[in-house]
Amino acid sequence: MSNIKIKIENLYKIFGPDAKGLTSAVKDGLDKDELLAKHNHVLGLDNINIDIEEQSIQVIMGLSGSGKSTLIRHINRLIEPTEGVVMVDNQDVTKLNKSELLEFRRNRTGMVFQRFGLFPHQNIVDNVQLGLSIKGVDKSESNQTAMFWIDKVGLNGFEYKFPNQLSGGMQQRVGL
């Protein structure tokens, strides 16, 4: 029996002031070019349905502008869906209130942006510890946790280097 970690059902994202009003037109066959030409709205996602099993690896691939980032940003609700359901561990992320969403983002999801923001004046350990110190974790515990994850992503020996001393891929792993 499969264990679904993330389930996305009937997800639509239309960018524009009357997005909700135009969803039914898109469902009835209005394509993205017509939506833009006639209504000056942009179709970001069109009826996306995905099940992601726990402990699986998935790849979201597509051309530039095809909606990959838009889709991913719906999982942690950095973007609000026009319509649809986004479930993580059987919890509908689209229904979380502000405090529940904050808790969800802090403790259950993470995201590494393509242009991540490492602090250039801090070494790798300090960059990794930053989130923990903001959460109030004591220095000893945050250092131990940081060293564990630095090891886990294969950056042993680089703990006290600065971001500009690492390759882009290594910096990406620090961002993880």
Model-flagged regions — what are they?
Residues 6, 43-45, 104:
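Conserved structural motif at the start of ABC-family nucleotide-binding domains
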Residues 82-85, 141:
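Conserved coupling/switch loops of ABC nucleotide-binding domains, chiefly the family-specific signature
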Residues 121-129:
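Short coil-to-helix segment of the ABC ATPase nucleotide-binding domain corresponding to the Q-loop/switch region
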Residues 35-40, 94-110, 134, 139:
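ABC ATPase NBD coupling module
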Residues 97, 105, 125, 151, ...:
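Signature (C-motif/LSGGQ) region and adjacent switch/coupling loops
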Residues 76:
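Helix-to-loop junction immediately C-terminal to a conserved catalytic motif
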Residues 25-34, 89-92, 129, 133-136, ...:
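Conserved ABC ATPase "signature" region
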Residues 162-166, 170:
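Conserved ABC ATPase signature
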